[in-house]
Amino acid sequence: LHPRVRRQRQMCIRDRVDLASIGFVDRIGYRASMILAHAMAAAGLILLTVLPECLGNPFVGLLIAVMIYAIGGGLLEVLVSPVVEACPTDNKEKAMSLLHSFYCWGHVGVVLLSTLFFRIFGIANWKYMALVWALIPIANGIFFTRVPIAPLLDEGEKGLTMGELFKKKIFWVLMLMMLCAGASEQAVSQWASTLAEKSFGINKTIGDLAGPMAFAILMGSSRAFYGKFGDKINLERFMQYSAVLCMVSYLMIAFIPVPALGILGCAVCGLSVGIMWPGTFSMAAASVKRGGTALFALLALAGDVGCSSGPTYVGMISGALNDNLKLGIFAALIFPVLMIMGIKMIGSLQKYD
């Protein structure tokens, strides 16, 4: 499977998991759900090394394994943010941003260590690498049998139902912001290596590392920066400035013909989109009281839809313009523009409430 196709299929599964989680997470509890999520993630990675050879059709085996760890990943996406939001921290926005920075460090670590492993031991030994990565969710699942987990809602308090959330105007603005956060991020991230190779004429191996790696490192740095200094920074203003910087990065990618500056544009995009996803989660938690699991699950769903639709939109526009990927990225300016509009609308709705 092409990595982009595999990613899209994982997103489809995660969308369904996001919706399904609303019905059972509160029923079985966050601890059981977290352990289940890690077990599914580990099982999928382990089965990746076994099923393709056990089944008559290797592709079917690969697909089943991917589906299993995608379910685990989708559950984790829904669960981890509310668990951290419930922690008794002084500044929840800082904690949320720091949490999401580890998504980026995980991305960087997997790419670097896997590349190093394959360079030393050869790609034929990829199964051992998959088993090594499976140790992380196994260990984390064991930890979650012991760590204290604070309740998201006060005792006796009930979270809002989906119907109650749907009646709130502010909820729909937050959903739009999450969609734009995912789309702004993945519109460049998923096309970064192709941009480096086809549009900037950079060697494929270097392009695969330079584009996505620079993007992930700066995205993680942005989140870690807010995680450290967030108590001194206005979140809404920081998100608006970041959306403007995102627009600048798209223009750099689309119109500057110098390859080095094009790669720099990809990196700047990572820096700019870093705060969008965790920032929207934090704004939602502060704006929608008693949102509970349903709020976080639906926001995760909107983010995943953005992660799928953003690069798809870029690809469609590029295809209509003679495969001009730069103009496809330029067309994605609509996402940070809508993000800015959403942030301003949230401020107005909060004053109205």
Predicted regions and their residues:
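Interfacial helix-cap and linker-helix signal at transmembrane-aqueous boundaries
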Residues: 24-25, 116-122, 196-197, 229-230, ...
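Helix-loop-helix hairpin linking two adjacent transmembrane segments in secondary transporters
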Residues: 90-91, 98-149
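Extracytoplasmic gate region of multi-pass secondary transporters
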Residues: 168-221
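Intracellular juxtamembrane helix-capping segments at the cytosolic ends
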Residues: 75-88, 275-288
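C-terminal ends and interior cores of transmembrane alpha-helices
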Residues: 39-56, 245-257
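Central cavity-lining transmembrane alpha-helices of secondary-active solute carriers
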Residues: 10, 14-23, 213-225
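Single conserved hydrophobic/aromatic residue that forms the stacking wall/gate
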Residues: 1-13
